[in-house]
């Protein structure tokens, strides 16, 4: 089984169907994360040998949650996790990669161009300055839940959702003020992943 075939099978176990082109681009993204994101300090060197599970698959599991959305934003996108991964998996979804740090925003521009992610756009600025509103906001390794919600609520349309990636060791928190938790999703096939906490305005 080739590398891309293996990724397609792993994605299938998460309920995500990838065609060969999508799998190939995600495999190339793994290489870019190793070659560019680790030296930049966006991805930990300790993740070098587990980028697929720790980052690609962990991000990919959010795709089925947002299949019905038209416009999403990845807050503090960093290296494009989960934004680039979800944008590749869901080409109909328009993705805004929000990153205020210039070097990381430049990395995102390179990734989007090299992988041909035409439905993703980089916004080099603060969350409060980004265009909106959006249907979905992602927060992965961005901020504690209450802080992530405080920033996300201002860019979500009525009925919009925050998809928050809780750490593997994190106890599921109570909803921040003004929010309600719609669902808490766990992924048993990814042992190192925490829960996805889905929230909206109360």
Q: Model-predicted segments: where are they?
A:
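S-adenosylmethionine
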Residues: 83, 90-202
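Class I SAM-dependent transferase core
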Residues: 1-73, 103-118
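Short, flexible active-site-proximal loops enriched in glycine and acidic residues
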Residues: 74-75, 97
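Class I SAM-dependent methyltransferase "Motif I" SAM/SAH-binding loop
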Residues: 76-80
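Short loop/turn and capping residues at structural boundaries
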Residues: 22, 48, 87, 123-126
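Short, charge-rich binding segments
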Residues: 65-66, 87-89
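Acidic, metal-associated active-site segment
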Residues: 59, 81-84
């Amino acid at each position: 089984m080739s590398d891309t075939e293996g990724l397609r099978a792993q994605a299938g176990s998460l309920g995500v169907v990838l065609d060969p082109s999508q799998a190939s681009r995600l495999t190339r993204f793994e290489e870019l994360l190793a070659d560019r994101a680790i030296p930049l300090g966006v991805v930990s060197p300790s993740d070098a040998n587990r980028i697929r599970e720790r980052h690609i698959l962990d991000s990919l599991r959010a795709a089925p949650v947002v299949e019905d959305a038209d416009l999403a934003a990845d807050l503090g996108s960093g290296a494009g996790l989960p934004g680039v991964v979800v944008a590749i998996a869901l080409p109909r979804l328009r993705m805004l990669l929000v990153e205020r740090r210039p070097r990381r925003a430049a990395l995102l521009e390179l990734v989007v161009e090299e992988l041909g992610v035409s439905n993703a756009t980089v916004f080099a600025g603060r969350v409060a300055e980004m265009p909106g509103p959006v249907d979905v906001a992602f927060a992965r390794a961005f901020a504690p839940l209450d802080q992530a919600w405080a920033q996300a609520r201002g860019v979500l349309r009525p009925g919009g959702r925050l998809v928050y990636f809780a750490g593997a060791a994190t106890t599921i928190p109570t909803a921040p003020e003004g929010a309600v938790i719609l669902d808490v999703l766990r992924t048993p096939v990814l042992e190192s992943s925490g829960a996805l906490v889905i929230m909206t305005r109360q």
